[in-house]
Amino acid sequence: MQTEWNFDAVNSAQEIILKPGKYKLECWGARGGATGTPLSDGFYYGKGGYCSGELTLRKKTALYVYVGFDGKKGSQFNGAGYCGSATGGGATDIRLVDGNWDNPQGLLSRIIVAGGGGGTRDRYTAGSGGGLKGGIGRDFNGSPSHGGTQFEGGKGKYDDGSLDGSFGKGCAYPNPSAGSGSGGGWFGGAGGNGGSFGSGGGSGYVLTKDSYKPPGYTPTSEYYFDNVVMTTGGNTTVVGNYSDGRAKITLLQALPFLTVSSYNSTQATFKVDHTDPTLLTKIEYFIDDVLKETITTDLTTEKTINYTLEDNALHTLKIVVTDSNNATAEKVLSISKNIMPLPEDVNLNDISTKLIEVNAGFKTGKTSII
């Protein structure tokens, strides 16, 4: 069974469908590009950021992976600010909605992002990608070109905002033969102005209970991460003189899951599965918390169970599936059986009598509603 998936930079979304389970998701942003005359120890381009977290999926889930390119390749994919060989690095992210990388609904569905590094010219320092926030780029006077943050794009040198980063997008000086481009990210960094200038890095992001959710953000609490790590400049991998982004998903724990397709007052139909079906051990079902049957064979085939319920009562059906690690999945269903069956000529006294009967049923143990 496959437990690890790796994603390299390509110019489109990469889809993966994951079964329920506990996973570690990791993203590395791409390095910024550099051009001109470097110092003796090389260009001061911004490195890509690194972000990771652990996510438990309770249902089969489609995720879409977008991996940014080294800015030296001059690609604007996934938010890099274009400026020739001094283009910023593209962000790397995993999201719930696919389409073009700059699709607004897609950007608002990102659950983890690693920022791209800023591009630079000559000997001037660019900011690395985030991490919690992108690093700062500098020009020959030391003036800053800020990195993206959790709440806004990096602020550039010009007061008119023309070099500022924005949500999911870096920025660049309008003339590709001058200035430099910033890194893409959760929020992009600020671009460098004309002449020799290092741009800001894009910020990273990991969805948690306390993380910022912008207006229109769509992922819910079922996608909250635990054990989060966010490192600015955390991508130090160089392959063939390029440092593209990359992503990795690792299965940490296989889990059972259960889908109920139909149920009524006499029977229920359901299907059990598992990230690793060989780990399944048993299925149990309960009526009003009383165990009715334990199933230990053919666990992944669709099952229909039959039961008899008392009239004029409210009942609970609970189905529990267990694996060899004692991990469980369960469904609790509410079922009523002939509650208050009344004749056509019913009157208020009849209704009152039936309500008294239901109340008596609760007192004798019929306390669950399904």
Listing of model-derived features with the role each one plays in the protein:
Residues T281-Y285:
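Short beta-strand elements bearing conserved aromatic residues within extracellular beta-rich modules
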